[in-house]
Amino acid sequence: VKHGNRAVSSSCGSADALEGLGFPLDVAPEDVRRLLDERNFAFLFAPNFHPSFRNVGPIRRELGIRTLFNLLGPLINPARPTHILLGVARPELVELLAETLRQSHIRKAAVVYGAGGYDEVTPLGPTKMMIIHNGRLTPMSLDPLDYGIQPCNPEELAVHSKSEAVDVLKNILAGKGPRA
């Protein structure tokens, strides 16, 4: 179950990409279980589940920078997952968010800060991580070189539009994705 929104600080957010792949965003909360059972995947479009946040969307887009809502979103996933992968855009947030998850209903999680300032694992270099399991925090690093992956540069990861991001995703799903 993926919980997300449209792009705010990038050219394509998870909702934009999934919409481009043909996933409907206007799914009513009561239909999510059926979709999950049918497809083994469901996308929870944040504005459908948190109507009061709709008012801040235009302000966030106008600001064009990360805000508290980037951190809050994964923490208020209405599916209340017990396992989660959470990316943060600043290294000092890894431990803070890991501790927050440790004190919640989460049983197992990874909080990641990717090389290059990304809120996800990247092939740019080592990813700082904190694993939460059975109430314990374990710091670790994930280096692409350890898996035979040569680091790339940020330009190789960049997409400049929603349509480009969707094309890249389609190629990845077809087994023809880019190196980075």
Question: What residue ranges belong to the model's regions?
Answer:
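Substrate-binding N-lobe of the ribokinase-like
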Residues: V1-D26
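Glycine-rich anion-binding loops and their surrounding alpha/beta cores
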Residues: E19-D26, D31-A180
